[in-house]
Amino acid sequence: MMMAMAGCVAAAAHAENTTLSDSSKVFDIDEVVVVSQPKEVMRLRQQALSSTSMSSSLMKKMGASDLRDLSLFVPNFVMPNYGSRLSSSVYVRGIGSRVNSPAIGLYLDGIPVMSKSAFNLHNYQLSRVDVLRGPQGTLYGQNTEGGLVKMYSHNPFDYQGSEVKLSYGSKYYRNVEAAHYHKFNNHLALSLAGFYEGEKGFFRNTFTGERSDQYDEAGGKLLLKARFNSGWKIDVLANYQYVDQNGFPYGKLNLETGKADLPASTFPGTYRRNNLISGFKLGYSGRGFDFSSVSSYQYLKDRMLMDQDYLSAPYMRILQEQLQNSFTQELSFKSNRAVGGFWNWTVGGFFSRQWLKTNGPVFFDEAMTTPIGNGIQQQMYSAIHALMVKTMMDKGMPEAAANAAAAAAIEKAGGISMAVSMGAPGVYHTPQTNLGFYHESNFNLTSRLVATLGIRYDLMHTSIHYQSAAFMAMTANMMGQKATFTLKSALDGKAKDDYSQLLPKIGITYQLDDQQSNLYATVSKGYRAGGYNIQMFSDILQTELNAHRQQAMRGDYDVPHTPEDYEKVNQTISYKPEVSWNYEVGAHLNLFDHALHFDLGAFYMKVKNQQLSVMAGNYGFGRMMVNAGKSHSCGIEAALRGQLANGNLDWMLNYGYTRAEFDEYTDGEGDKAVSYKDKKVPYVPEHTLSAMADYRLQLGSSLLRSMVLGANVNMQGKIYWDNANSYGQDIYAVLGAHVAFDLGKVQLNLWGKNLTDTNYNTFAVDNAATGKREYFAQRGNPFQCGVDVSFRF
């Protein structure tokens, strides 16, 4: 890799000696869109890390309205579009998570978004998005092991006026956005923005007849900024969003063809969410240092209902209602000029407290309870029938006659029947407290060489109070005698854990030339917090009910639990923190007098106790997090971005390769143990590729100033859907295009997505609710087209 990097350096040197007639230049986004950075002292492409930045205009060209869309154009960074807004899985360099602790951090206008359930937001009126890949734990703490995403709204001090955007597309897609930016004076500015978006959806449930992916969402945000001559500044912000949608359009997957059917679940999946992110930021720029205080309060209330078996027969449903309140406080200081001409520093502390209450019952329906009742009924009938036959035969009746007579007697007396009802209610309180202290120094060893040293101490306290139960009510009608017996298993327990980590970082950057091209190398530690699985309680309790079913045949029975039982449960539901070491080398090259930016990086990660999301236990009633022993991932990332034709042609090309494999991971015990050593880590694409080109035709007309022709493509694959690598998604590509017209204060944009109507799956899962393993997947969205009309005044 170092030889390849040296070759790139040589090419860069040659390129810089080449003078082109084209005067087009590509600027770092830090030079164009300046935002508050309370911790960093250098621009992104001057730091020892891999990153991708997107401006407002670039996001509009790509048609990106949320992080799922943005991820399509970032190498080795994937947020698949599936499920609902609750689904916020992100996979970066072989690190990822479907549930519980996230693999990346998300900052919205400088506020850390604390709930993973809130990551999948509608993005609008943004000036800039930065995606940092690789562990960012030194400055940003736990759960930034895969990277960090920072989103920034327009600054009303720099951006004034009003905007209205109206959009309409196929499948009854509609969108309305309105925003106003006002600068009262040099000391006070305000922005207000709101949106509504909805869509009929692509996938019709063949059982219910409803669209399984229709949605409506709306929200608003406020940003008030104050600046004072004394060096102080204040920001007050609030961002509220509401979503109401059908979701989880999973259809049966044909493993041979790789194609998924339309969804056919008995119960329509739904998701509703209220989410508020608010913050108060206080800053001061003094002599030699900057001070920043960031306080936030966040509220999330949601409700998910999902058909857990995804079949047209009613087996089971799961309800999940979350109520979360979070508070964060961060204080940071950094130098605003080099001490002694060579030392820049950052120091700070972070505190957060989260309160989360989850109501998560599992409902068992007729397709599951009827076979259980029939099985018990058959056992009862056989036992009574055999006893009657024996009695008759003892009196001298022939066996055949005794069998017939016993059956007739049972039928005449009212027969034997058994009705079973089951449920698994549960309420879980899982508060968390996090405390971190950090320091980072950047030393200018020479005019071109910079060394970075950082360290963070991170402490997490997590606890759980679970009140969970499972019951089986059996109503027996035995030859005219009716009785109901209830078998119940209830757990009411508590557990707690403390985790602490030191998160160091060492980096070095060497500037190659006066164009700010540089080479870098870095070593950093990543960390993802441990915690508790709550969705697996129904599986634990159902296993207990099956083990004690016979006791309920004689009357009501409550399964007893000893302190040893609770200790075993606490060990079963907990999972350990995930820890990784990341080794990375790379280059940020500015070529042809800044007409071309070329970023190249290579990484190797060693992961211990990798957290994986799997279906719980024997029945697959819910997802749970488990720890694999060890894994590793390695790969490369390359990004090219340039301008040609006097700035009229914008283009970019991104490629990422990740090879993520298990080194130690054995699931199960004894004869049932399965080793996944050398298997690929699931849900991680091996290749990611994206490209975009926009050509502007300057028309010079007073009515039509210019026209833009643009096209983009993104590619992913191969992706495995399980630890055994038994099935997956082959590599696929999705093509998009748009034509934009500049009419002065009016902008018109015609767009199309998935122009070739590529058939692919964004997610797949299996379960054994029916007693045999079934496979399901969600299709990627098919062809769609539409139009945007924007007004600015």
Protein language model features and the residues they cover:
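Transmembrane beta-barrel wall of Gram-negative outer-membrane proteins
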Residues: 161-163, 168-199, 203, 207-245, ...
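Membrane-embedded beta-barrel scaffold of Gram-negative outer-membrane proteins
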Residues: 281-286, 290-306, 518-522, 535, ...
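N-terminal periplasmic accessory domains that precede
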Residues: 67-70, 90-94, 107, 143-165, ...
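N-terminal periplasmic "start-of-domain" segments of outer-membrane beta-barrel proteins
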Residues: 26-60, 87-89, 157
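Short acidic/polar hinge/loop motifs at secondary-structure boundaries
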Residues: 109-135
